[in-house]
């Protein structure tokens, strides 16, 4: 395997000229075979989104089978916009990120995957949040997986950086105080690369040693109060603190005014904060898929704010028709929102379910064959015993006086991603 694609593989692949970089005849992503960006299903993935009660649906999603011209490769992503133009930014990133990443994979994989001058050692650049199974392939002495991971990680980082630059140059989208999260993955054969930006989440449904289906979180919500994120933000003169009305929600603020109060430490857009610690560098991790791994769920925080990882995995596993899995998760999340928080506005929800074994997605939507999800008696209505993972639950070697118990999200947040838009003509602090 070595790198993403060997030289021989690249020559042998029959990729339509319109689907790769070069020339003016490139086909738009919307016309690409195997690409789904709305409610529906393909051979190995299903998608569903539903607007909440806060206004325009700012969530976006995509699944692209036969990605990169390979029958064994799929790209998936969900994007949660915020701010006045968050819906436009989420859709823009959804539409351009996969193709930009595809271009860079072709560029990078034929050369040395990572320059030592650009990126330090592999172990230093691994996510400080990833579980041991998602950390450096070199730990297992697998050189070919290290090369694959290095090359793909560099492609992810370049693609995210380039997309952020494109957003800044967009004249028809104001991204000064608007942005989006992104949790994305590429599955190529048994290799899985996850790139995460913000607080959307990827969760794996896998079998444990007792053959019980359990949830394994592949990403960690990148919040401003994680020690490493907070140190970077403060070095850049940004501020991290919780508003008095939301003492449990740390936010990122401008140096001299109490805005915008962004509830994440990494995002596309939000250029008013890019000089003050907000970054668009993805947290990239690697995992080898095994026969025990059954599916992956990508979802925005409208789902994770009310359902635990295990509840989502249980819902997907209980669906008789895989086409309905994503919709079943959204249905349960909406039901739980209404039950738990009857006075709160339901958040937008977007879900992508990627199935890892050989069986294809079957069934249909509600009212069609295959839609009879046996949901676990709305288990989300009762407070789960399992603790939602936060950055502080993972030891990154930093000195922190905050214990895991103090940070456990036993209750669920219903926060707005942005609290206030900055007034750039007035640098005096605003009163809250």
Curated annotation (Swiss-Prot):
Keywords: Hydrolase, Magnesium, Manganese, Metal-binding, Protein phosphatase. Residues 44-356 form the PPM-type phosphatase domain. It comes from the Eukaryota. Mn(2+) 2 binds at residues 80, 301, 347. GO terms for molecular function: metal ion binding; protein serine/threonine phosphatase activity. Pfam families: PP2C. Residues 372-408 are annotated as: Disordered. Its EC number is 3.1.3.16. It catalyses: O-phospho-L-seryl-[protein] + H2O = L-seryl-[protein] + phosphate; O-phospho-L-threonyl-[protein] + H2O = L-threonyl-[protein] + phosphate. SMART domains: PP2Cc (SM00332). Its cofactor is Mg(2+); Mn(2+). It is an enzyme of class 3 (hydrolase). Gene3D superfamilies: PPM-type phosphatase domain. Mn(2+) 1 binds at residues 80-81. One of its GO terms (biological process) is regulation of intracellular signal transduction. Binds 2 magnesium or manganese ions per subunit. PANTHER family: PROTEIN PHOSPHATASE. Belongs to the PP2C family. This is Probable protein phosphatase 2C 75. The lineage of its organism: Eukaryota, Viridiplantae, Streptophyta, Embryophyta, Tracheophyta.
């Amino acid at each position: 395997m070595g790198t993403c694609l060997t030289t021989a593989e690249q020559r042998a692949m029959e990729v339509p000229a319109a689907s790769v970089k070069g020339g003016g005849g490139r086909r738009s992503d919307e016309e690409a075979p195997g690409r789904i960006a709305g409610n529906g299903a393909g051979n190995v993935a299903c998608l569903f989104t539903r607007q909440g009660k806060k206004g325009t649906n700012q969530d976006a999603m995509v699944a692209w089978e036969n990605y990169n011209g390979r029958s064994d490769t799929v790209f998936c992503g969900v994007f949660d916009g915020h701010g006045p133009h968050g819906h436009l930014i989420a859709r823009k990133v959804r539409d351009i990120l996969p193709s930009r990443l595809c271009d860079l994979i072709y560029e990078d994989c034929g050369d040395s995957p990572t320059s030592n001058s650009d990126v330090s050692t592999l172990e230093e650049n691994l996510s400080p949040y990833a579980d041991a199974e998602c950390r450096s392939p070199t730990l297992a002495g697998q050189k070919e997986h290290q090369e694959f991971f290095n090359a793909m990680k560099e492609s992810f980082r370049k693609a995210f950086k380039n997309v952020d630059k494109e957003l800044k140059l967009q004249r028809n989208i104001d991204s000064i105080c608007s942005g989006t999260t992104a949790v994305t993955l590429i599955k190529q054969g048994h290799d899985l690369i996850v790139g995460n930006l913000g607080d959307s989440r990827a969760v794996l449904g896998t079998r444990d040693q007792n053959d019980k289906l359990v949830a394994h979180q592949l990403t960690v919500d990148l919040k401003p109060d994680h020690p490493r994120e907070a140190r970077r933000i403060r070095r850049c003169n940004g501020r991290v603190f919780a508003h008095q009305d939301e003492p449990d929600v740390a936010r990122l603020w401008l140096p001299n005014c109490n805005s915008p109060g962004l509830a994440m430490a990494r995002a596309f857009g939000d250029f008013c904060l890019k000089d003050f610690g907000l970054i668009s560098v993805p947290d990239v991790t690697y995992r080898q898929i095994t026969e025990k791994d059954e599916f992956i769920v990508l979802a925005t925080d409208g789902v994770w704010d009310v359902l635990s990882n295990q509840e989502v995995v249980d819902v997907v596993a209980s669906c008789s028709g895989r086409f309905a899995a994503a919709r079943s998760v959204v249905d349960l999340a909406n039901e739980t929102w209404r039950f738990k928080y009857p006075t709160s506005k339901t958040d937008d929800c977007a879900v992508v379910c990627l199935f890892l074994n050989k069986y294809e997605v079957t069934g249909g939507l509600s009212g069609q064959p295959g839609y009879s999800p046996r949901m676990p008696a709305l288990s989300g209505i009762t407070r789960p015993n399992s603790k939602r993972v936060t950055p502080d639950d993972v030891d990154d070697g930093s000195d922190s006086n905050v214990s895991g118990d103090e940070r456990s999200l036993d209750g669920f947040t219903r926060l707005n991603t942005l609290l206030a838009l900055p007034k750039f003509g007035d640098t005096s602090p605003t009163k809250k």
